[in-house]
Amino acid sequence: MGQTITTPLSLTLDHWSEVRARAHNQGVEVRKKKWITLCEAEWVMMNVGWPREGTFSLDNISQVEKKIFAPGPYGHPDQVPYITTWRSLATDPPSWVRPFLPPPKPPTSLPQPHSPQP
């Protein structure tokens, strides 16, 4: 029997009613067909490392946001509801997203101040 691999995109589609409700709670509307197109094509073509299957990596989401929120004719205001909803899933994940979150980055240690030697 064939098994399908669950990806961040397929996961959001499997829970589409919850994704739409989350967007609605943020005051925006998202459409399934556009969600798929943005994830599989538009964001991939931005050449910022977005994978076709989607990701809950905040680094990748931030890179896409930089393109979407770019000023003037370079931005993509029509995509704002989609990337903000995607970020919301990554930063405040429902139980079905948690197993797909990337592992947290180890904290970077800051240099410790040296006490003066007598």
UniProtKB/Swiss-Prot annotation:
Gene3D superfamilies, alphabetized: Gamma-retroviral matrix domain
Region Disordered: start-end pairs: 97-118
SUPFAM superfamilies reported in the protein's UniProt record: Retroviral matrix proteins (SSF47836)
Record PTM: Specific enzymatic cleavages in vivo yield mature proteins.
Keyword annotations: Lipoprotein, Myristate, Virion
Subcellular location: Virion
GO cellular component, one term: virion component
Composition-biased stretches (Pro residues): 100-118
Pfam families the record matches: Gag_MA (PF01140)
Lipidation (N-myristoyl glycine): G2
Additional facts recorded: This protein is synthesized as a Gag-Fgr polyprotein.
Protein name: Core protein p15
Annotated organism of origin: Feline sarcoma virus (strain Gardner-Rasheed)
High-level lineage: Viruses, Riboviria, Pararnavirae, Artverviricota, Revtraviricetes
